[in-house]
Amino acid sequence: MAVQTRLRAEGSQLRLCDTHHAGKPRSVEGSIVRIYMENFLTYDICEVRPGPNLNMIIGANGTGKSSIVCAICLGLAGKPSFLGRAEKVGLFVKQGCLKGLVEIELFKVPENIIITREIQVVTNTSTWHINRKLTTLKTVEEQVAALNIQVDNLCQFLPQDKVGEFARMSKIELLEATEKSIGPPEMYQFHCKLKSLKEKERELENVCKDKVNSLEKMKQRAERYKQDVDRYHECKRHLDLIDMLQRKRPWVEYETVRQQHEDVKQRRDQAKEELKNLKEMQSPLTKKIRECEEFYNSLNMKIKNTADEIKGVSQKCKEKQDALEMKDKQISEINQALRMKKDEEVDRKKKILSAYKMIDEWNNELNTVTDCENLQPQIDAVNNELKHVQEERANIDSDIGDVTTEKINQERENGRIIDRIGQLNNIIKVKEETLQARFRDTHSALMWLRKNKHKFKKEVCEPMMLTINVKDNKHAKYVENHISTNDMKAFVFESQEDMELFLVELRDRQKLRVNAVCAPDKSCAETLPSTPIEELHRYGFFSYLRELFDAPLPVMSYLCSQYHVHEVPVGTEKTRNMIERVIKETKLKQIYTAEEKYTIKVSTYTKLSFSTNMCLRPAQFLNYYVDTDERRQLENQQQNIKHILQSLDKQLMTLCERQKHLECRDNELRQQKKELLERGSRRKQLESKIAVKYDSIRQLEQNPINLEKESQQAKVKIRAINIQKAKLVTELMCHIKNYVSLNICKADLILQSTAVDAEKNRLEAEYKAASVELRASEQRFLELDERKRILTENCKELLKKARQMCNMNLDQHLPKEFQTAFQTLPDTLEEIDAFLNEERSRVSCFTGLSASVVEECSKQMEEIQKLMESIEENKKELDDYKQSISKIKERWLNPLKKMIESINEKFSGFFSSMESVGEVDLHVENEEEYDKYGIRIRVKFHNFTDLHELTPYHQSGGEKSVSTVLYLMALQELNRCPFRVVDEINQGMDPVNERRVFEMFVKTACKESTSQYFLITPKLLQNLTYNEKMTLLFVYNGPFMLEANKWNLKSFCRRRRRLGRMDEQ
């Protein structure tokens, strides 16, 4: 069952000093006397009675201070969107209730105004009452506006969620808000009227300019019209002449074509007679050509038969010639075999002589060689040393192989590391390109930092979106949703001095919009979570946010300090399904489920938990993971491999040199062994060689060749082959004689065939020439016949056309009036066309003329007169606008300048008391552009900087809060509004500035001439200066508090004074 919460104290009389004895406090008309809330946000029932001057509403976070601000805004016809909390008014009703109520009582003479708003949750609508009577929203808005209450003006009403928007207001918006807030009622009206009149003046000037241009063009057209009237009549005369020429031209054309027809008809008849004669002459030639072709074909048949016979005889001759060549080849082979026998015998004798000579030489050497001493000890010694050298070489070869294998492995590993580092570098490059595309100023600052790191005393970390590496891409959305975009692109410093140097250079000098933060002096990166993650596993949590990513130590320290990433657990869908149990059983302030983020706040008094949730947006910057530990390990491994490779190269060089030395020694020992072995076996070798050589001589002497016998056998074989050749020659001569006689016969037939072919070609040429002439004659006849037909049709068409041009019937003769008119005109087509072109050229000079030109001319003159009168009226109206603008500008600008001077005086004084500098001035780009006027606020908080315009980006949050408060205070004494509301403006201020600002608040808001002020704050510094005109409203709530109507304030004050006296004793 839900525990109901009520505001337990009224603060209207809770002051440090009772002021009833001084008379009733003065109230400004429209100031708030009472605020009543029922089922509104955190309250069941609550009534607040503020004082007429400064009201300090104090209470812990979650007690309902801002709920009072929301009630003021919504109760005075404000829109929910202005509060920056929710778009629907129904969402401001307490959860579980169907309707809520807000009632505001405003001071007014003679009777206060009570505005009531009842909110329906189901329909999201509101019912309005004024002084308990039903009314409309428009009536409420008019009543509120009549009291100069502007809850949509940030200069008057500044909710907690809209504090940042004040700094984001443009100069133009700030001027309009200030005019509405403290200017006389007519000031903003004059400003709006000036803008409207200036816009109308521009429009009227453009209209006048357009009309003057139109008048000039119309005058030029009217002048042309006068000339066109005279030219019209002259043009008409030329047109009549063109019409008569066009009537005569078809008759002349008809006569020309008729004459052509007669001429073509005569030529066609002549061509027909010529064609008949040519056909009669061509018949004999055809007969002669046919006879020649028959004789020519019979000769070709005889030539072919003779050629076949010649081919057969030629083949027989070739066969006999091949047989003769074969016999010649057999004789050559017999002679070649005989020569080879002779050469073989000569070679045998030479080998025998050479063998005897070598035997003599070896015998001589054998006589000189004696038995050598025993060489075995020397050979054994050489063998032992050679074996030792070979073993050492084998060992070195093995070592070289091992070293080479190790080098190859190390080089392969180095290549793998280089590839992996390249992949990591590519990921870093992609992240930098994303930074450049989204935040160009931050990327420019990054490039400057990398070139100027030597200027900083301590480490400077690049933007967090580059240095944070999420270990798993699917977890990137948790980190990005937890860290604001401004901090994602922020540079992280370890030294405040380094950060100021960085900001002065980039913000002030280079005008770049960059963010920077400073890590805590004491590192928080290793801070342990209050609850081990193992205890949260049962709720579906698998890790704290800090364990999901890597970051440099300063960045991690800042995130732990600012965002408590070591205390924010990340869960799964299981966590989402049991979220109510998680919130109830754990003391977590922020948690993440699979797709949502939950923020839990606990009321200080009721101990109830309030949670809000939001869907996680997809990750944009941290999708790419770069494992810095892996990169560092890879770089260290790369250095180690480099040293190992250098060492291996040295070992390899030493082993190669040793191997080369052993190889030389091995060769020397082998040569020594060879020489010793040769010295011991030379005599045996010589004796063996001599015995072998005697054996080869015996074999050579046992196989002699009988050359005479071989020669006789060769002659017998050659004689038999020659007899066969003689027979083949006789047969060949018979075939040759037959071949010659057949060729002579063939030649005679070819000569006859050639003569017949020549005669046939001559006859065909004559026939072809006759055929060409016949076809030409036939073509000429057809062309003339076709032309005659076409001319006949043309004559008929032209005659018909000529009669139509003269509006005549088909059987009517040319009237006399046309004959008379035609006599004065040219008689040939060329002359008529030339005359027509000349007249048409003249007519073409009269372009744009018509019968209505006279009427248009008079009409144009009337329009000119009307336009001139309109221009005079517009000029008069424009002068009236300029006079009105001048008068209104004087009535608006002079009071505005005085007002801004007064604001500047107060604003500068406030800043001077805070040992800072601030200015307010009227910013004008062009005096005539009233929609561009604006108020410019410039501030300076540090001696080493210049005055800078107040913007959302340049100043820190605390500096913007101080500037906003002091500007609102500067408006306070000048303000016409009945009350002003500022919600938690001291957030982000340092204690010194907060104390100074509070003292200024008290001093300014507690004057007699100032209106009511509401200052909402969750905390107050100790030992502040208070004023008896202040009203302190303490907000307490919880399930065990007394109800508001049972609170005895006097009894509480007596008890407090009694306790105070006891403390003094």
UniProtKB/Swiss-Prot annotation:
Notes on the domains: The flexible hinge domain, which separates the large intramolecular coiled coil regions, allows the heterotypic interaction with the corresponding domain of SMC6, forming a V-shaped heterodimer.
Protein name: Structural maintenance of chromosomes protein 5
Coiled coil: 134-156, 186-400, 628-805
InterPro entries attached to this UniProt entry: P-loop_NTPase (IPR027417), RecF/RecN/SMC_N (IPR003395)
Family that this chain belongs to: Belongs to the SMC family. SMC5 subfamily.
One Gene Ontology molecular-function label: ATP binding
Biological-process GO terms, alphabetical: cell division; cellular senescence; double-strand break repair via homologous recombination; positive regulation of maintenance of mitotic sister chromatid cohesion; telomere maintenance via recombination
UniProtKB keywords: ATP-binding, Cell cycle, Cell division, Chromosome, Coiled coil, DNA damage, DNA recombination, DNA repair, Mitosis, Nucleotide-binding, Nucleus, Telomere
Quaternary structure (record): Forms a heterodimer with SMC6. Component of the SMC5-SMC6 complex which consists at least of SMC5, SMC6, NSMCE2, NSMCE1 and NSMCE4A.
Region (Flexible hinge) residue spans: 441-627
Recorded name of the encoding gene: SMC5
Major localization class: nucleus
